[in-house]
């Protein structure tokens, strides 16, 4: 697949529509107004917006926020985003009352100006990829740039439908970075290449395991999904989370991957999952106990493999990360990945939180901004938002 970068285009004097990911977390403050609790996604879009402005573009920004079910909802307005963007961009940001229609047409920016459209999902046509709605969006601009990797797995009007209707389309700088790192990891990674997968369910990551199994030298599995594999090996799992309907699949994956697949060799177990619950470390999960994290022997074994890697792909926690002290395995893995010196690609909210908790964010090569999109990419799926840029 070949696509253009925003850097390949002449933006001077052109209206450039940038599809960004401003799906930020909001909460009501004491005055009842919605405020942003994390502006990470806004800041992630700044390089592309600044590049467009520096090269003489009139910038139109578009995003969804939340799930307003196809109608306006003041609690999911992008107005707080416009205010925050203006602060961090240090350029005035006009806020449109809608994303299409005569009012928006009347507000179209001049070169050097920024207009933020209202939430795309206030129109049901966005998620339906409605051709007429896509045409209205396309009519706003001359150049289309997709910088919303987190929405690239959706075939919506703003990510796919309108792209065919514009004169030129390209990837933004953030999108380009995502595709560079994830593409390298899944096609031609520096070796040894190690993948670490965690999280609760095998069913969420079957395709990822199968696809990465073709590429990686070692695949380390932690989190609750490991217990389905342990059961497939005939080992006791106590009351740990097991997907019984996936045990046969786990058996076939074990046979296929052989010694390349590594599972936990010890476990942190509890009688009940509760804050402050007493725990013990065991090699074999006893009857009636629930495994909630990988144990120290597993941390050591996983860390040793990671230390010798040239590429590390990590997605998903090693235990019940949100309930300390059962976050220790995940934090230890974060430190191992950061200390490896390998090209490291991390995805998934808990893995990202673990990197922060371990204080090693600056030592990770790339933290993916797309949850579902990065998983689908790792699974080898075609992302509609990326395929639409193919030229």
Curated annotation (Swiss-Prot):
HAMAP family: Phosphoglyc_kinase. One of its GO terms (molecular function) is ATP binding. Keywords: ATP-binding, Cytoplasm, Glycolysis, Kinase, Nucleotide-binding, Transferase. The gene is pgk. Its EC number is 2.7.2.3. This is Phosphoglycerate kinase. Substrate binds at residues 21-23, 41, 64-67, 121, 154. It catalyses: (2R)-3-phosphoglycerate + ATP = (2R)-3-phospho-glyceroyl phosphate + ADP. GO terms for cellular component: cytosol. It comes from Solibacter usitatus (strain Ellin6076). ATP binds at residues 205, 322, 348-351. PROSITE patterns: PGLYCERATE_KINASE (PS00111). Pathway: Carbohydrate degradation; glycolysis; pyruvate from D-glyceraldehyde 3-phosphate: step 2/5. Belongs to the phosphoglycerate kinase family. Gene3D superfamilies: Phosphoglycerate kinase, N-terminal domain (3.40.50.1260). InterPro entries: Phosphoglycerate_kinase, Phosphoglycerate_kinase_CS, Phosphoglycerate_kinase_N, Phosphoglycerate_kinase_sf. It holds the Pfam family PGK. Monomer. GO terms for biological process: gluconeogenesis; glycolytic process. It is found in: Cytoplasm. The keyword Cytoplasm applies.
């Amino acid at each position: 697949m070949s696509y253009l970068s925003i850097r390949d285009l002449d933006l001077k004097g052109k209206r450039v529509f940038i599809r960004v990911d401003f799906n930020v977390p909001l909460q009501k403050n004491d005055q009842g107004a919605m405020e942003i609790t994390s502006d990470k996604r806004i800041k992630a879009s700044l390089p592309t917006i600044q590049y467009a402005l520096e090269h003489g573009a009139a910038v139109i920004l578009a995003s969804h926020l939340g799930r307003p079910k196809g109608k306006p909802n003041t609690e999911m307005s992008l107005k707080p985003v416009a205010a925050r963007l203006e602060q961090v961009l240090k350029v005035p940001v006009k806020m449109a009352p809608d994303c299409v229609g005569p009012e928006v047409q009347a507000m179209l920016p001049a070169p050097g100006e920024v207009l933020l459209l209202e939430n795309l999902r206030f129109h049901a046509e966005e998620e339906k990829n409605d051709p007429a709605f896509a045409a209205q969006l396309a009519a706003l601009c001359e150049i289309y740039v997709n910088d919303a990797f987190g929405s690239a797995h959706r075939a919506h009007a703003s990510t796919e439908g309108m792209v065919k209707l514009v004169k030129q389309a390209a990837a933004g700088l953030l999108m380009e970075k995502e595709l560079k790192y994830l593409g390298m990891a899944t096609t031609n990674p520096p070796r040894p290449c190690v993948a670490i997968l965690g999280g609760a369910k095998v069913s969420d990551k079957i395709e990822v395991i199968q696809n990465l199994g073709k590429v990686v030298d070692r695949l380390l599995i932690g989190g609750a999904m490991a217990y389905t594999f342990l059961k497939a090996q005939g080992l006791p799992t106590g009351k740990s989370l097991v997907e019984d309907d996936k045990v046969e699949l786990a058996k076939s994956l074990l046979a296929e991957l052989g010694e390349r697949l590594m599972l936990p060799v010890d476990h942190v177990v509890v009688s009940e999952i509760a804050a402050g619950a007493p725990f013990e470390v065991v090699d074999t999960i006893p009857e009636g106990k629930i495994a909630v994290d990988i144990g120290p022997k597993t941390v050591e074994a996983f860390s040793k493999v990671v230390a010798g890697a040239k590429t590390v792909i990590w997605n998903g926690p090693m235990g019940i990360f949100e309930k300390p002290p059962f976050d220790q395995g995940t934090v230890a893995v974060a430190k191992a990945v950061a200390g490896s010196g390998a090209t490291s690609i991390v995805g998934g909210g808990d893995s990202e939180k673990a990197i922060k908790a371990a204080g090693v964010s600056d030592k990770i090569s790339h933290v993916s901004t797309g949850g579902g999109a990065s998983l689908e990419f790792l699974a080898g799926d075609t992302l509609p938002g990326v395929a639409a840029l193919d030229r």
